[in-house]
Regions:
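C-terminal accessory "lid"/substrate-recognition subdomains
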Residues: 1-107
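Short acidic, S/G/P-rich loop/turn micro-motifs used as interaction or catalytic elements
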Residues: 7-9, 115-116, 135-137
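Generic recognition of short, well-ordered alpha-helical segments
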Residues: 12-16, 122, 142
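Short, polar loop motifs at secondary-structure junctions
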Residues: 65-68, 111-117
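Nucleotide-activated sugar donor-binding and catalytic core shared by glycosyltransferases
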Residues: 68, 97, 135, 155-157
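Short loop/helix-cap segments at secondary-structure boundaries that form the rim of catalytic
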Residues: 75, 117-125
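Conserved active-site loop/cleft motifs that coordinate metal ions or position small ligands
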Residues: 82, 107-112, 128-131
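Short, flexible loop segments at boundaries between secondary-structure elements
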Residues: 86-87, 123-154
Length: 157
C-alpha cells in the first residue's frame, strides 16, 4: 500500500510506481494507492467546531508528527501560530506549560495522535483535534477481497 498519495495521482503515474516497485522487489504483489483526507470539523471533549471557523480564527496549531505541512496548510491562516514537535514526542510538563503560554486563551488544534497524549492535561478546555481518514484512490473492493480471502485461507489451515 502506497500511502499519502496526492488525490490527483494519475493512472499513468500509478503504473510507473507499480513497475518501479516490482523491479525493486522482484515480486508480483498487488499495489494499492491511498490518500489522506481531513474532516470538515475539529472535535474535543466539549463537542465539534467547523473547520471553516478554525481557518478564520486566531488559534494555535500543534503537531508532533513526521510531516506536519499538510495538517498546517489545511487549517492555518496568516494569524495562526504553528508549533512543531518531533514525531512520537512525549510532552513534558514544561512543553505543556510552554504551549499554554503561547496559546493564551486561543483554541489549540492538534492531530488525533497528539490529542490522545494531551487530552487530560491543563490544555483540555481549549484542545481540539482534526480527524483524518485514509481512502483508496481506486481498487478498495479488490483490496478488501484480497484481505478477506487471505484470512479465510489462514483459518482453513
Amino acid at each position: 500500500v502506497v500511502t499519502k498519495c496526492p488525490t490527483t495521482l494519475s493512472e499513468a503515474e500509478q503504473i510507473q510506481i507499480k513497475q518501479k516497485l516490482r523491479r525493486l522487489s522482484k515480486l508480483n504483489q498487488a499495489v494499492y494507492f491511498t490518500f489522506v483526507s481531513y474532516s470538515s470539523a475539529v472535535n474535543s471533549k466539549k463537542g465539534s467546531l467547523p473547520v471553516v471557523q478554525i481557518q478564520q480564527s486566531n488559534c494555535l496549531l500543534l503537531a508532533g508528527i513526521a510531516k506536519p505541512t499538510s495538517f498546517f496548510n489545511y487549517l492555518k491562516n496568516s494569524e495562526t501560530i504553528c508549533l512543531t514537535y518531533p514525531d512520537h514526542h512525549h510532552f513534558t510538563d514544561s512543553d505543556i506549560q510552554s504551549i499554554k503560554e503561547q496559546a493564551g486563551d486561543k483554541l489549540i488544534v492538534t492531530t488525533e495522535k497528539d490529542y490522545v497524549r494531551l487530552k487530560d492535561s491543563v490544555l483540555q478546555e481549549q484542545l481540539y483535534y482534526l480527524p483524518i481518514q485514509t481512502s483508496f484512490i481506486s481498487a478498495s473492493d479488490h483490496f478488501d477481497a484480497t484481505i478477506l480471502s487471505f484470512i479465510e485461507q489462514e483459518f482453513q489451515k
